[in-house]
């Protein structure tokens, strides 16, 4: 049975549970559960992750934890009973876990690894806390580390900042807003101080280090590597200050044996020291670790003599240094231990040994040398911080290693009480000694002893260095042959304090002989006492000691014999009468120098201090001694502090009147000395002395008297230094006074209490007197007052010991009240006064409610005065923060209500005014980045905001009621409401608190909404009816709107756990404010009309909030607005216009963030079904206009949604452009808002410019230009345009548009604008501008003829599915591709822009299922442009560069073809039933335009019969052959004729092996002719085209014969043989063919009479179809836009012989082979032999859209790119096609090519092909382009650019659009991307859906120096073949055919340019002259003819068609071409 649990309430899942039982709860390991019931080993409860789901789970899967249960029962809550920081770590790690993984996904790898490290650290620290084995200090340290890491992680993950106090999360309800603000500030600073490594070097979290923290260096010697000494060594380590040139620490001594190990075996691994007490100042000094190496052994290392074994000398060996600065830079963390190597150097001259370390540091390399590279000391260093107690506690392992404590010489910066030292540091400086009759100098050794007064040598009183035991004697090191040795060796003398007096030092000097005996001979000594007769010790100075002569026989047993002698010069002056007959005689020529430094807390070197302490010995000198006390150093005073104080008070008791003032001054001096930070730690010593040792019971009287006397004198004295010092010592003076009075009261049982109180009263009167003095003219008095005010708050605690709280408060109030107001004193005094008040508020006195009642009014008075005058705002805010903190803490007390009332009356208004001033200054400062003043910073704004919020939070109903009742008039109330609403608005607009201060921001919002609820009733009550005030109401509404839109209140974007926490604590404050807003709107009544349309935008912003309830509340307001305006104006145009404007501006300003994603659903609710604004509208009289309005706004929102989505993210430019065009059209066509339309024109133009779409940018700006007239009407300033006339603006626009057309190389579009401008300039006689514009126009003509331009590709894209943006959804577009962009690249671009889209694999129109699905489908294939201006393309004399422009510009129609079989399919010849389905697309606008793509407006579908298709295929092939042949016929040298070879080979080879023979079989068959009698004319036409092809091939072979390379002769012979076979196959069908090409006859071997069954050709059949015939004009050739891709046109086939069985069954098979029959040389790059491809060779590709082996680029033969990439051909033909299209097409720009090797049936490549390959590029190399597919990597990459010269550009022509003004009309959206084309640096590209081959560069066509050939087609067929030397056509004219060879020859020789000659039976027509001016662009085009489907084909075939593209002109040939054209034109007229 299930029973409720009593104890088991909370637990952690220790094993995951799948919940496989009924009612089972799925649990993950680590989750926490709340347990409700239990039953036989099972629990029932909920997971804290999903508190709404209850279930059961096994009890043994749960680890129980203690918890606090509140509200037991159904709604009980459980809080785990564990450390709050552990709970926080757990929750934080769970929150970080998901975010951490996202970092990896977003490629933020660095932060990913850092966060992982921190998370692991947190887990470890949490484990330490949970272990329960830590001390309190350790727990505190662990918590500090945890909080630093938590804050660091939250900061870097963008999470909320957590306010803390003592490492615990604070509850915002328990503290004041001011305190909460400071905690946020503190946490933020802590986070900023922590580094990415979570630095632990910063001060403890939440603490301020008042005292400097000492540093310590831990040094450990690892090893000393040396191999040449062979003797024991002493290594001395010390710290050396290079700047000061002195050692600052004791020495650390390590004694090593000759093997480098420690001499003492116990020292192994324990050679370590701690250099202590280094201050921060020391760490900034130029410090070095210096190591001196002293060897112990022979005098000379290389001395072979063996001296006595007992004699060892200390000899200098070497030195090493290490910079502390280098150490600190390498130690990145505190406590990090790191190894360093110190290289040891030896001294070149021993006399300079004392300076060797300086020389090494200075790098004076001439004075030292390195004995060996292997000499070095390896040490490890570690930096520690903190006092010694802390160091011992935190690093116990260090102290367990026999650590040597190495102290600083002298005291540290902070002298700690109880630090007892008595060390004398003696430095052996130098000596000067006589040679003593020797020829060489001496080797001098100094021996030193410490002797007591009785002559006893003191044991263990000499220390050479820490780390080794003390010794009784010291032996210096010996410098070889030096009579003036300089040692510089420091020795420490730790002499016991009781032995110091009477002790002396004796120095004995010996010469160490290097002779055989090696003895040491004594020759002199010196001595020095340690204390003088006056009791002072040896001074810290250099002392010169007298050297006395002696010898080995001299005895020192009787020390009195020499102690009576003077030891130095000072001593000599004290002993004037010294007998000369003493046993020891002074050597006057010898001297010895030592220096001493005393570090003692018991001994002094100061005579004055000794005199004070022994004043009773000389009582008459006491006045003098007290006067000299201030000259004693602070170190001496603090050492003897208690003794000095006792002495002073004894003197005071001895004679108060005589010594009182002097003792008072001395006491003040000592007290102020302890204010120095160096002695600050001695304040506790002083406190202890006062409490326990002070015994001056009568002292208080004299102290009060002196203090009062000082204050009374302050008005008169000019010098007040001593008075100011007394004021600074006020705290301790009062401590002495109070303690003295307590002692007196105890002794006398409280006698003289009244006198004491009276004296204190009088003292305070004097204090008030001092403060009341006018100090404006006296700087001295000002300093005195400042000193008094600074010290005044420190005496409160002392007074509270003697007086009640009220009495002390009265004292303080009187004192603070005596200060002059801020008007009368200077700024510096203001600061001091406020600081005094601040310390008063922070004192214990202010925490009592009794005292606050007394003090608060005077404190508020002073603050009010300062705030009114805007002075010292930062200090005032600190005081207010302290007051609010205290009031919040005491809020349960009854007196707090009264205090809050007092603060409201005094502060609320001035706080609001102050905040407004600060915010306005801050705003102005942001606008003008000038100097920063403290009052304008975010910090001070935050301080005052927190103060205001604290006050408002403390206010209750009563306070608000009193506040509102106290206003004397409505004007005052209005001013107050405006102020507070303005402050609240600024709070939300300025973001005073950072975004991650979520706790602070939520609390602020809660206070604001509560305050507004109180104030809204006053607003309604006072300003509604007759007293309506628009300004107040508007301010209120603006505030409410801002409040609801606050980012911090948008709960939808935060985690569910955080959302629940906020809702539990505050509720949804947006809903609360929305209800207030709606209620106030309803209260407005008829005044609502004042806010229409002004509040439409703000209220609309509120509805953007994705909160259903808020929308519910707000939507009726819109109906209200429409209703009220309808009543007033009879319409609601204003509402409509304003709504549209505001919606647009919100989007443009980027407002709304994520909520805009909800906008569309919002509007369907807002104006659609939701609370049914639409239903309300339908009930009104204005129903129709209302519904129209709703519809328009909904449509606008759809577009704004798309625009917002594109603009805000990392969307591609094409989407942004498309959205902008879409929106622009909407404003123009549907709403007719011209200003918005123009704005979006400029936005679109900017986007085009950014994408470098200059032509589109020009067309876009042209829209605005067309709206303007050439008038002088003034225009206002708009956008970036200044105020100017309409004429000026239009002129500027025209110039800019012309400039953009020039940059876009669209000169034809710019020329009409030039003419328009020229007309204007001419009418104004502005000849300068006219000249400029005419030159510009002329330069454009030059550019058209000379500069190279690329022809773009065009692609049809269908966007299907509901997931696409609105402007693309279920629509199809045609896109103008970028330069060099082929189908595959375009397709990849589209798929990358729509990563969710799926590419459709078929060209069929999608069904409704796809159109309505929630997905994205893309259907992409290439289309062929159908140019509108065919008349330009038909003109013979128009240069090809001009024609090429019209082929791809001003194009509105495009087509693509799909093959299919109609009727029964003939397996023997499938061409009979192969039809073409031709789709023509008509766009809404011509390309190019304002976008790179436009929507398809209309589709037309026609079918092309097999015969018509065959005619087009053969006709196009003939045209290509003529064009190519004409390019080669003018060459006079043997150039590269690969293209001609390939083209001829492809046609002849295909014809021999099937080619046109298939057409003969299909269409010349009797059965076909009989079945299709209507096709007779077409059959005749096909026959004529075949005859023409044979003739053209003959001409081509003649040209080939002329230029063929000798190595290619076999190929040429093969071509001639195959040509004869081809002619023979057609002989019986066309008997006249044998006479067509005699140049090729001779080896004619007819293959068979293929056409024998057909009737002979009629005489008419010999006529050649003119190239301008309707049939010929059906298709056009053109340049491709990409040099990286070759789009195989319909006439392009592959040079592959198809075997009889190679035809497939599908219509695509036949269509494919039809293409192969007539290969196009434009799409081939190599001559290939015949390769039989069977169906089994095809390698199907997986995708016709994405595969590199995609479908052939063209569906039919007549269109150059009509179906590029059409996915209609099956994959199985792709490889075959790529194999056959071997070399790239001709292009007008460089590229690379791909060549698959053709393989014969026997597997061997053909010889001619190999020869050609070698001729072209030598050996072929496999292509290794990583972008290629596996199939392509077997191809060969041939680069023709290396051996071909480039040709010129094709000159384009002028446009055919006009610049007339156009009305506003919609322009379709364009989804094209602005990205540039593919990088041209990649020389090899894979085949693609477009072609399967790469393009060939323009250099394939010979040398640029040659005249550009004409590429027009041949007019007629000559009866005889041409000679190979003759021209096929003259330059610049089409090829003409005559019926006789002589006519041809005559025409060629007689005239370089000839007119058209007509074929037989054709009357020649006059050639059409080119127009004088190019056709004007922009003229409305003729409407397309409407046809029936059956007639359409015929009519279309009769339409003229543009020519195929020609070879480009060479650069620089344009001028020559122009001259020839002019001459040619003249000849034509003649």
Swiss-Prot record:
Record: disease: A chromosomal aberration involving DOCK3 has been found in a family with early-onset behavioral/developmental disorder with features of attention deficit-hyperactivity disorder and intellectual disability. Inversion inv(3)(p14:q21). The inversion disrupts DOCK3 and SLC9A9. Neurodevelopmental disorder with impaired intellectual development, hypotonia, and ataxia: An autosomal recessive disease characterized by global developmental delay, hypotonia, ataxic gait, hyporeflexia, poor or absent speech, and variable and mild dysmorphic features.
Entry keywords, A to Z: Chromosomal rearrangement, Cytoplasm, Disease variant, Guanine-nucleotide releasing factor, Phosphoprotein, SH3 domain, SH3-binding
InterPro entries noted in UniProt: ARM-type_fold, C2_Dock-B, C2_DOCK-type_domain, C2_domain_sf, DHR2_DOCK3, DOCK, DOCK3_SH3, DOCK_C_lobe_A
Name this polypeptide is given: Dedicator of cytokinesis protein 3
Record-linked CDD domains: C2_Dock-B, DHR2_DOCK3, SH3_DOCK3_B
Expression sites by tissue: In normal brains, it is localized in the neuropil, and occasionally in the pyramidal cells, while in Alzheimer disease brains, it is associated with neurofibrillary tangles.
Organism the protein comes from: Homo sapiens
Locations listed in the record: Cytoplasm
């Amino acid at each position: 049975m299930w029973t409720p649990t009593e104890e088991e309430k909370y637990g952690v899942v220790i094993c995951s549970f799948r919940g496989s039982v009924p009612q089972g709860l799925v649990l993950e390991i680590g989750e926490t559960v709340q347990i409700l019931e239990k039953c036989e080993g099972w629990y029932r409860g909920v997971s804290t992750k999903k508190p709404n789901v209850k279930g059961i789970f096994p009890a043994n899967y749960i680890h129980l934890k203690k918890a606090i249960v509140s509200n037991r029962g159904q709604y009980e809550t459980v809080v785990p009973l564990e450390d709050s920081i552990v709970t926080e770590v757990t929750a934080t790690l769970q929150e970080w876990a998901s975010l951490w993984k996202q970092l990896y996904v977003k490629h933020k790898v660095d932060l990913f690894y850092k966060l992982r490290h921190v998370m692991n650290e947190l887990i470890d620290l949490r484990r330490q806390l949970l272990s329960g084995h830590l001390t309190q200090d350790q727990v505190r340290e662990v918590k500090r580390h945890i909080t630093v890491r938590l804050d660091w992680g939250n900061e870097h993950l963008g999470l909320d900042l957590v306010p803390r106090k003592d490492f615990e999360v604070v509850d915002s309800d328990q503290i004041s807003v001011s305190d909460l603000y400071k905690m946020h500030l503190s946490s933020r600073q802590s986070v900023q101080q922590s580094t990415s490594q979570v630095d632990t070097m910063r001060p403890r979290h939440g603490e301020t280090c008042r005292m400097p923290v000492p540093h310590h260096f831990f040094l450990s010697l690892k090893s000393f590597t040396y191999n040449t000494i062979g003797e024991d060594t002493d290594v001395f380590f010390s710290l050396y200050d290079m700047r000061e040139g002195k050692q600052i620490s004791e020495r650390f001594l390590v004694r090593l044996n000759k093997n480098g190990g420690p001499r003492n075996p116990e020292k192994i691994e324990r050679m370590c020291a701690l250099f202590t007490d280094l201050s921060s100042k020391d760490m900034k000094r130029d410090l070095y670790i210096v190591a001196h190496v002293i060897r112990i052994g022979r005098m000379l290392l290389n001395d072979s003599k063996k001296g006595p074994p007992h004699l060892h000398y200390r000899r200098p060996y070497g030195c090493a240094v290490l910079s502390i600065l280098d150490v600190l830079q390498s130690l990145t963390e505190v406590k990090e231990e790191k190894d360093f190597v110190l290289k040891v150097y030896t001294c070149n001259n021993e006399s300079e040994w004392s300076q060797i370390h300086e020389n090494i540091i200075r790098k004076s390399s001439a004075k030292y040398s390195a004995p060996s590279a292997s000499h070095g000391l390896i040490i490890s260093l570690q930096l520690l911080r903190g006092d010694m107690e802390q160091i011992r506690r935190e690093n116990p392992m260090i102290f367990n290693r026999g650590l040597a404590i190495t102290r600083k010489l002298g005291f540290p910066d902070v002298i700690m009480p109880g630090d007892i030292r008595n060390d004398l540091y003696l430095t052996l400086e130098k000596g000067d000694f006589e040679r003593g009759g020797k020829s060489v100098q001496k080797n001098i050794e100094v021996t030193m002893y410490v002797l007591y007064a009785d002559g006893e040598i003191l044991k263990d009183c000499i220390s050479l260095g820490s780390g080794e035991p003390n010794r009784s004697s010291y032996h210096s090191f010996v410098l070889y042959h030096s009579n003036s040795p300089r040692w510089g060796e420091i020795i420490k003398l730790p002499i016991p304090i009781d032995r110091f007096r009477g002790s002396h030092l004796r120095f004995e000097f010996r010469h160490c002989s290097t002779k055989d005996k090696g003895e040491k001979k004594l020759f002199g000594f010196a001595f020095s006492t340690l204390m003088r007769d006056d009791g002072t010790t040896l001074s810290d100075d250099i002392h010169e000691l007298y050297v006395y002569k002696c010898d080995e026989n001299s005895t020192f047993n009787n020390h009195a014999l020499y102690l009576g002698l003077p030891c130095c010069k000072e001593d000599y002056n004290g002993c004037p009468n010294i007998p000369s007959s003493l046993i020891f005689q002074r050597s006057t020529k010898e001297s010895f120098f030592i220096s001493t430094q005393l570090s003692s807390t018991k001994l002094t070197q100061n005579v004055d201090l000794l005199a004070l302490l022994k004043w009773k010995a000389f009582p008459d000198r006491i006045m003098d001694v007290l006067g000299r006390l201030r000259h004693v150093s602070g170190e001496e005073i603090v050492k003897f502090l208690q003794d000095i104080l006792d002495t002073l008070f004894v003197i005071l008791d001895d004679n108060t009147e005589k010594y009182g003032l002097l003792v008072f001054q001395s006491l003040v001096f000592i007290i102020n000395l302890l204010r120095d930070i160096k002695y600050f730690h001695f304040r506790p010593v002083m406190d202890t002395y006062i409490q326990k040792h002070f015994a001056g019971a009568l002292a208080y009287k004299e102290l009060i008297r002196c203090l009062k006397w000082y204050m009374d004198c302050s008005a008169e004295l000019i010098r007040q230094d001593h008075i100011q010092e007394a004021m600074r010592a006020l705290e301790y003076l009062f401590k002495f006074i109070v303690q003295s009075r307590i002692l007196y009261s105890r002794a006398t049982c409280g006698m003289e209490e009244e006198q004491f109180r009276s004296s204190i009263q009088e003292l305070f009167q004097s204090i008030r007197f001092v403060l009341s003095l006018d100090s404006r003219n006296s700087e001295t008095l000002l300093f005195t007052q400042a000193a008094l005010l600074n010290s005044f708050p420190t005496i409160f605690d002392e007074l509270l010991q003697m007086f009640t709280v009220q009495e002390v408060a009265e004292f303080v109030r009187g004192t603070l009240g005596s200060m002059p107001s801020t008007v009368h004193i200077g700024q510096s005094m203001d600061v001091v006064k406020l600081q005094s008040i601040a310390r008063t508020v922070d004192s214990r006195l202010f925490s009592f409610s009794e005292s606050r009642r007394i003090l608060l009014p005077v404190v508020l008075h002073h603050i009010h005065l300062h705030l009114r005058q805007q002075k010292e705002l930062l200090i005032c805010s600190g005081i207010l923060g302290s007051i609010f903190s205290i009031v919040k803490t005491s809020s349960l007390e009854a007196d707090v209500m009264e205090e809050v009332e007092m603060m409201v009356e005094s502060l609320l208004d001035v706080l609001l005014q102050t905040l407004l001033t600060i915010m306005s200054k801050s705003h102005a400062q942001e606008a003008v980045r000038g100097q920063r003043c403290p009052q304008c910073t975010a910090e001070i704004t935050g301080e005052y905001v927190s103060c205001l919020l604290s006050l408002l939070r403390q206010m209750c109903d009563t306070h608000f009621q009193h506040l509102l009742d106290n206003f004397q008039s409505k004007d005052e109330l209005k001013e107050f409401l405006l102020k507070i609403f303005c402050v609240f608005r600024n709070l939300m607009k300025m973001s005073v608190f950072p975004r991650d201060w979520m706790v602070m921001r939520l609390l602020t919002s809660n206070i604001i909404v509560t305050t507004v609820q109180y104030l809204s009733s006053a607003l309604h009550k006072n300003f509604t009816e007759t007293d309506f005030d628009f300004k107040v109401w508007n301010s209120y509404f603006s505030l409410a709107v801002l409040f609801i839109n606050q980012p911090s209140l948008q709960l939808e974007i935060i985690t569910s756990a955080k959302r629940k926490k906020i809702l539990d604590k505050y509720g949804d404050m947006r809903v609360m404010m929305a209800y207030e807003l709606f209620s106030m709107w309803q209260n407005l009544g008829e005044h609502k009309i004042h806010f229409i349309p002004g509040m439409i935008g703000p209220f609309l912003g509120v509805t953007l909030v994705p909160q259903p309830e808020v929308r519910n509340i707000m939507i009726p307001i819109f109906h209200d607005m429409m209703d009220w305006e309808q009543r007033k104006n009879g319409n609601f145009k204003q509402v409509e216009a304003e709504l549209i404007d505001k919606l647009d501006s919100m989007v443009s300003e980027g407002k709304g963030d994520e909520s805009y994603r909800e906008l569309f659903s919002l509007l369907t609710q807002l104006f659609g079904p939701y609370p049914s604004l639409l239903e309300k509208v339908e009930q009104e009289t204005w129903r129709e206009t209302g519904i129209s309005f709703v519809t328009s706004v909904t449509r606008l929102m759809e577009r704004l949604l798309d625009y917002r989505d594109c603009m805000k993210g990392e969307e591609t430019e094409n989407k942004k452009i498309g959205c902008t065009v879409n929106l622009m059209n909407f404003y123009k066509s549907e709403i007719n808002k011209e200003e918005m339309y123009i704005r979006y024109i400029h936005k679109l133009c900017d986007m085009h410019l950014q994408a470098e779409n200059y032509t589109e940018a020009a067309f876009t700006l042209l829209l605005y230009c067309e709206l303007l007239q050439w008038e002088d009407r003034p225009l206002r300033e708009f956008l970036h345009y200044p105020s100017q006339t309409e004429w000026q603006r239009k002129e500027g626009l025209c110039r800019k548009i012309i400039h953009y057309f020039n940059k876009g190389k669209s000169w034809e579009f710019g020329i009409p604008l030039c003419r328009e401008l020229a007309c204007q300039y001419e009418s104004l006689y502005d000849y300068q501008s006219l000249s400029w514009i005419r030159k510009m126009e002329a330069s454009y003509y030059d550019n058209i003829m000379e500069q190279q331009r690329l022809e773009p590709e065009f692609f049809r894209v269908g966007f299907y599915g509901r997931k696409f943006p609105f402007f693309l959804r279920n629509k199809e577009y045609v896109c103008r591709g970028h330069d060099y962009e082929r189908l595959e690249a375009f397709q990849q671009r589209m798929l990358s822009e729509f990563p969710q889209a799926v590419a459709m694999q078929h060209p069929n129109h999608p069904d409704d299922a796809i159109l309505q699905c929630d997905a994205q489908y893309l259907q992409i294939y290439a289309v062929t442009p159908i140019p509108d201006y065919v008349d330009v393309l038909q003109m013979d004399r128009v240069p090809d560069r001009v024609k090429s422009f019209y082929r791809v510009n001003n194009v509105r129609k495009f087509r693509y073809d799909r093959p299919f079989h109609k009727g029964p399919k003939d397996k023997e010849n499938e061409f009979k039933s192969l039809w073409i389905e031709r789709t023509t697309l008509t766009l809404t606008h011509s390309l190019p335009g304002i976008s790179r793509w436009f929507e398809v407006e209309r589709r037309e579908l026609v079918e092309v019969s097999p015969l018509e298709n065959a005619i087009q295929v053969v006709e196009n092939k003939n045209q290509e052959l003529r064009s190519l042949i004409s390019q080669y016929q003018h060459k006079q040298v043997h150039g590269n004729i690969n293209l001609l070879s390939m083209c001829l080979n492809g046609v002849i080879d295909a014809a021999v092996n099937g080619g046109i023979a298939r057409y003969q079989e299909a269409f010349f068959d009797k059965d076909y002719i009989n079945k299709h009698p209507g096709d007779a004319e077409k059959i005749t036409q096909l026959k004529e085209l075949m005859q023409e092809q044979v003739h053209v091939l003959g001409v081509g072979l003649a040209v080939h014969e002329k230029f063929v390379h000798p190595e290619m002769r076999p190929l040429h012979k093969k071509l001639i043989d195959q040509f004869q076979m081809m002619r023979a196959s057609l002989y019986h069908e066309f008997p006249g063919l044998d006479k067509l090409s005699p140049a090729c006859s001779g080896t004619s071997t007819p293959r068979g009479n293929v056409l024998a069954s057909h009737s002979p050709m009629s005489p008419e059949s010999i006529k050649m179809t003119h190239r301008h015939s309707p049939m010929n004009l059906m298709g056009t050739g053109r340049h491709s836009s990409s040099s990286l891709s070759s789009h195989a046109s319909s006439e392009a086939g592959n040079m592959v012989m198809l075997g009889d069985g190679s035809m497939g069954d599908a219509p695509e098979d036949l269509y494919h082979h039809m293409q192969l029959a007539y290969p196009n040389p434009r799409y081939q790059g190599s001559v290939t032999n015949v390769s039989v491809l069977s169906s089994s060779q095809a390698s199907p590709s997986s995708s016709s859209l994405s595969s590199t082996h995609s479908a052939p680029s063209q569906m039919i033969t007549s269109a150059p790119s009509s179906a590029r990439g059409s996915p209609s051909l099956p994959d199985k033909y792709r490889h075959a096609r790529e194999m056959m299209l071997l070399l790239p097409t001709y292009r007008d720009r460089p590229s690379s090519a791909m060549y698959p090797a053709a393989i014969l049936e026997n597997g061997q490549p053909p010889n001619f092909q190999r020869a050609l390959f070698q001729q072209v590029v030598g050996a072929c190399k496999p292509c290794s382009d990583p972008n290629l597919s596996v199939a392509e990597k077997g191809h060969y990459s041939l680069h023709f650019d290396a051996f071909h010269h480039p040709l010129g550009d094709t000159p384009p022509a002028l446009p055919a659009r006009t610049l007339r003004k156009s009305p506003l009309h919609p322009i379709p959206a364009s989804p094209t991307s602005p990205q540039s084309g593919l990088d041209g640096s990649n020389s090899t590209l894979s085949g693609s859906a477009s072609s399967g081959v790469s393009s060939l560069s323009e250099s394939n066509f010979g040398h640029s120096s040659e005249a550009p050939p004409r590429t027009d087609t041949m007019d007629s067929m000559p009866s005889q073949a041409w000679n190979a030397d003759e021209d096929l056509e003259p330059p610049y004219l089409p090829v003409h055919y005559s019926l006789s060879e002589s006519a041809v020859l005559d025409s060629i020789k007689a005239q370089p340019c000839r007119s058209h000659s007509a074929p037989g039976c054709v009357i020649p027509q006059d050639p059409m002259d080119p127009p004088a001016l190019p056709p004007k662009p922009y003229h409305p085009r003729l409407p397309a003819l409407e046809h029936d489907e059956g007639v359409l084909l015929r009519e279309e075939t009769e339409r003229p068609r543009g020519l195929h593209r020609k070879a480009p002109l060479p650069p620089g040939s344009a001028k020559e071409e122009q001259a020839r054209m002019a001459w040619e034109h003249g000849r034509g007229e003649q």
